[in-house]
């Protein structure tokens, strides 16, 4: 498990979330991140529950199955549930865990613009930025607020990048309604 991370000097993206359920938007940003940043792999780190959101509607085992199914053709995307391994659901602990596996990993933590707005409230967010570069994907209705957020103003410009998207405005909550 995670042997793909043991190669020297590889670039990985980490997209964390509940994936309730995984959808086309997750795939699109993963593909764009891979292409723009030349990532070797992207880990979809599935969490049991997001501390900033309501309880997931779909059980974690089912969310993992759905994620594996929709990423079948995208072999660079690795579906992982690591909370039990690292004994934590915090992003900082996940990043530290990955760095322990391979200190040469170049990690890019991927988030939507909506998450950047509250990023300064995340546990040890400044340390996350030291250990991983941040890729922020535009989300309709969040651009201005995210670019003016506390975290956006405090992060050094070399540690994060804002990526504009052509319209792919679909969220997990919209997917559940379909």
Regions found by a protein language model. Give the residues of each.
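Nucleotidyltransferase catalytic core that binds NTPs
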Residues: 1-178
